[in-house]
């Protein structure tokens, strides 16, 4: 991140910011997650000063609000939603809106967005497994099984495959 700030090119800022955003989803420590979200937000913001028309950067910056950036999460959702309305087939926008719905407990909206992702990109294994998880959380075992079955063909980890079989 520091190297990207020094270089101050759109490419390096976006690479560092997207890398941090990707890692954020797996961070359980609230302090670290908030710090990383703020760092990613700062990188996205700097990149947007260089190119305010980069949809991926706008979506990424909006997504950082889901992970603890100071401010209202709705601000991030509105930025992402604007891109999704302009381009309904933008997988990144649809995915992050689904993720935002999941984080905020709006599982029906999250399912709707992840279904859209799988329509556009049928091999998006992350959306497939998140759908399975959301259906399972909601008590819809039938749909959970359907999506877990769809996802199994993308699993290469034998331990995970065994867990899915159970």
Regions found by a protein language model. Give the residues of each.
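TPR alpha-solenoid repeat register
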Residues: 12-13, 57, 93-94, 127, ...
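Generic helix N-cap/helix-start motif at coil->alpha-helix transitions
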Residues: 40, 55-56, 88-93, 123-126
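Alpha-helical solenoid scaffolds in eukaryotic macromolecular assemblies
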Residues: 62-66, 95-100
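Terminal, low-structured helical/coil segments at or just beyond the last alpha-helical repeat
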Residues: 91, 108, 125, 131-166
């Amino acid at each position: 991140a520091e190297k990207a700030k020094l270089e101050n090119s759109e490419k390096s800022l976006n690479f560092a910011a997207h890398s941090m955003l990707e890692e954020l989803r797996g961070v359980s420590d609230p302090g670290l997650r908030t710090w990383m979200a703020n760092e990613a937000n700062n990188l996205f913001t700097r990149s947007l000063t260089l190119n305010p028309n980069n949809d991926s950067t706008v979506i990424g910056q909006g997504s950082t609000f889901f992970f603890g950036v100071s401010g209202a999460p709705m601000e991030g959702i509105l930025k992402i939603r604007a891109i999704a309305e302009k381009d309904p087939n933008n997988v990144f926008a649809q995915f992050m809106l689904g993720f935002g719905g999941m984080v905020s407990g709006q599982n029906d909206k999250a399912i709707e967005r992840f279904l859209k992702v799988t329509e556009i990109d049928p091999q998006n294994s992350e959306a497939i497994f998140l759908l399975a998880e959301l259906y399972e959380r909601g008590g819809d075992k039938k749909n959970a099984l359907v999506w877990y079955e769809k996802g199994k063909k993308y699993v290469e980890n034998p331990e995970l495959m065994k867990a899915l079989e159970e």
